[in-house]
């Protein structure tokens, strides 16, 4: 590209970012476009796929997928991680299905978690807006968009038609919430369900509930799917899960994370550490044996994961190394010594 085109492109990009905000346009290969405060999702693989080490503060996030795919588990893991950092969290339980026993198993401090079970969609969104304007809440989870029922629908008869009522309600809420969330640096996570569009012959017939407003206002959209079962002998003890970043305004999108969600435990963090460690040559694998720093840590992935679970300092050290390797922007990484150039007249 010649200099004039480079200058024109730089001016155009500058104008776009000035008009629409940072992150509205980027090169696909960029690791991240700016330093955004993030909260870990509880899954190292997903933090790396997001490109910034977690989900962004002050933004709207949408998590969608089929039933029993791990949507609520992911948000509870994130709440637990946020609480460990001293953040205040709220859970708007529109589905009236939050299990405090399960939340506690995942590490959530249920004594400090704010919970609301609103009667109508308008009430739920007003509570969200009030919490955002207070500036005292850091993370809000709304479970789920499909359960945000407009007041007119609740007060009406079963067969009444309420075309587009929920979509209009959500569209208005997005316009109000976005600015308040940014000013108070509060993250709002909307869990959404999948529906099928009727009569779609070509392309993906799947869509999410509540109209298009949430898709536009969300800075990050995560598609979470169950891909298989984790078995201990014949007993199913968890789900193999794939999470795809379908929209990302803080880093390059379309990356995927593969993880395991164990029943009653949440993410299999130790298994992720082993897999990523082997992939990036921080953990050695010879046959079925895994070694770290020259010491054997277990035969088979299950035993290596058990070692990491019992030796939290080793797990924390490996986690830190992986985050530094995979999440540090290229310009911040220390320069490695260049390979010596071979002179043309040098004999081999």
From Swiss-Prot:
CDD domains recorded: RecA (cd00983)
Source organism superkingdom: Bacteria
SUPFAM superfamilies associated with the record: P-loop containing nucleoside triphosphate hydrolases, RecA protein, C-terminal domain
GO molecular function terms noted in the UniProt entry: ATP binding; ATP hydrolysis activity; ATP-dependent DNA damage sensor activity; damaged DNA binding; single-stranded DNA binding
Record key words, sorted: ATP-binding, Cytoplasm, DNA damage, DNA recombination, DNA repair, DNA-binding, Nucleotide-binding, SOS response
Keyword ATP-binding appears in the UniProt entry: yes
A cellular component annotation (GO) from this entry: cytosol
GO terms under biological process: DNA recombination; DNA repair; SOS response
Family: Belongs to the RecA family.
Record protein name field: Protein RecA
Organism, as annotated: Aliivibrio fischeri (strain ATCC 700601 / ES114) (Vibrio fischeri)
